[in-house]
Every structure is written in structure tokens, then in C-alpha cells.
């Protein structure tokens, strides 16, 4: 996010877009999130909290929920991965794992 980033401090804001799709036959609700964020210096930050972007959406079978958020880093690139804690109306709670994805300033990494 160039308008929010300031390389003189340094602070870089990275936007990311997530789509959560309910591929089950049950209604499910996103209860909480966990993010594991690593900058290019190897520093790790862990973020936990209820829902995402202030919401705990419920999804019927086949429905999707999309959101965009951001992650500030002190370096030009990093990586994040995590878990969404989901609760179905009927059944046991489960974790939806988010595979690692890169956060990088365009053209800063080959």
C-alpha cells in the first residue's frame, strides 16, 4: 500500500485479499483467526483475535465471504500464514489452515 508505506521510517503496509468459501453442507461461522507473520529479518509476530475485520461471518453451504486487510512490516518483504477457527452449527469446531503467502514490494524480490 504505497500511500501508507514510508521507507524512511521504515514501515511498509501490505494489503492482502482473502476469500473464505464454505465447501461443507453445514452452516459454519468464522470464530477467530491466528496469523504467523515473519519479516525478512526473521522477526516473528503472532496475531490472534475474534473474527476478521470486525466480523464473524456465518456461511451457508456454498457461500463465500471476502475481505481485504493489511499487514505492516519494517522490511520490504515477508511471509504470513495462519488458521481460521471455524464452528459449524452441527458438529465439532475445526481449523481452516491458510498456506504461506508472500508480502513483497513490487520489483524488490526476484
Say what each PLM segment does.
Residues 1-12:
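Low-complexity, acidic Ser/Thr/Pro/Gly-rich terminal tails and inter-domain linkers that flank the onset
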Residues 19-24:
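Asparagine-centered strand-capping/turn motif at beta-strand->loop junctions
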Residues 45-77:
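Intrinsically disordered, low-complexity Pro/Gly/Ser/Thr-rich segments with frequent PxxP/GP/PP motifs
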Residues 10-12, 29, 63-65, 78:
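Residue-level preference for beta-strand/loop junctions
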Residues 12-17, 81:
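Short, solvent-exposed loop/turn segments enriched in Ser/Thr/Gly
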Residues 72-110:
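Terminal connector regions
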Residues 39-42, 54-64, 103-110:
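Short, surface-exposed linear segments at secondary-structure transitions and domain or protein termini
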Residues 26-45:
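Short acidic, flexible loop segments centered on an aromatic residue
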